[in-house]
């Protein structure tokens, strides 16, 4: 009988550890979602505005076969100094209105710092 009791308590400990790990994972892996309005096939890629949590971009790539989506990722990566692998087009891959997800957990920046980087590019 002691074996059953000890296995149950070890299962409970494992479950508690797993819950703690899962909670820490949420804290350690923040994903910032930004609504982006994309104007593809522009003369040059640029940040137009960042108001009301909506980022407006001009992208030089055409909206054909996902080229504009790739252009968004490459442009944001270059301008914000964030790895391409940490930027993903979430919703709206075939729309001008998109949701871009940026994983800042390995970038050593906060959400506020990310937004400051975006705003600093508006002045250039």
Swiss-Prot record:
* Annotated Pfam families: DUF167
Q: What's this protein's name?
A: UPF0235 protein
HAMAP family in the record: UPF0235 (MF_00634)
Question: Cross-referenced PANTHER family, in alphabetical order?
Answer: UPF0235 PROTEIN C15ORF40
Q: Name one GO cellular component term.
A: cytoplasm
Can you tell me which family this protein belongs to? Belongs to the UPF0235 family.
Q: Which organism is it from?
A: Dictyostelium discoideum
Which residue stretches belong to region Disordered? 1-22
């Amino acid at each position: 009988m002691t074996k059953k009791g000890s296995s149950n308590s070890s299962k409970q400990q494992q479950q508690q550890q797993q819950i703690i790990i899962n909670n820490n994972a949420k804290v350690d892996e923040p994903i910032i979602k930004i609504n982006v309005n994309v104007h593809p096939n522009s003369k040059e890629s640029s940040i137009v505005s960042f108001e009301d949590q909506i980022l407006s971009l001009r992208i030089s790539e055409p909206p054909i076969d996902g080229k504009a989506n790739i252009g968004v990722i490459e442009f944001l990566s270059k301008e914000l100094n964030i790895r391409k692998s940490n930027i993903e087009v979430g919703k709206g891959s075939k729309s001008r209105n998109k949701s871009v997800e940026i994983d800042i957990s390995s970038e050593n920046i906060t959400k506020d710092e990310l937004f400051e980087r975006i705003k600093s590019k508006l002045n250039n």
